[in-house]
Amino acid sequence: EKDRALILVIKKFFGGIGYVSKPNASSTVEFRVSTLKDIVGVILPHFDNYSLITKKRSDYELFKQVVLLMLNKEHSTLEGIQKIVNIRASINLGLPNNLIEAFPNIVPTERLENYMDSNTVLNSGWVAGFSTGESNFFITVQKSKTKSGLATSLRFSIAQHSRDILLMKKFIDFFGCGYIANYTNRSICEYIVTKFDHIIKYIIPFFEKHPIEGSKYINYSDFKSASIIIKNKEHLNKEGLEQILQLKNKISSFYANKTINN
């Protein structure tokens, strides 16, 4: 709900089609386009021209197959419905149990796996937009043997399903820093930057030039403020450390609320 303004900008970008839902029980709003005319005339041309480069590309290509079947009115026949169910079985998390029971002869459609190759180059606008939705900015304060008894550090990260590890590696090339953590037990891979010099030299200058949109910009702003305090070594005194702790608590509160709402 707090990013409704950003959702409305997206709606305007697509020519005003669709609608923005009212907040649900978890305070989430959605931009939805459900008419075949708008999907065929606006949504498909956009994503054909500006291809997705995560695993969602596979879902999009399958979604497009369903749209074309409906455009040809094949969904009006039992055979066409079976084709759609076969495709649906390969999208997102697959089919709910009631559909599996209703269609016992399901043959899941093959997914596109090579949606990205080693020659793909990320562009700044895409990275800024992707970071708006998927990045995280953290301030860490830990006990240490320093005079204050506490040590501060910063962490920028982007996490995705492990199937998108090739994309995560692209961020290393794009930013010129960072590393990949692959959590095989959770099927998650993560691009991480923790070296303070790299955050100051690469991460913050990028987002100053290509700003993050929506409520996450506040997180970035607090993250940046903390970096300035650390750069000036003001975190070594009581007042500066208190400022760092306040900024850390603001960011932690944001992610805690996000987890609750989701």
Report the location of each language-model feature.
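Sequence-level preference for short, compositionally simple segments enriched
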Residues: 1-262
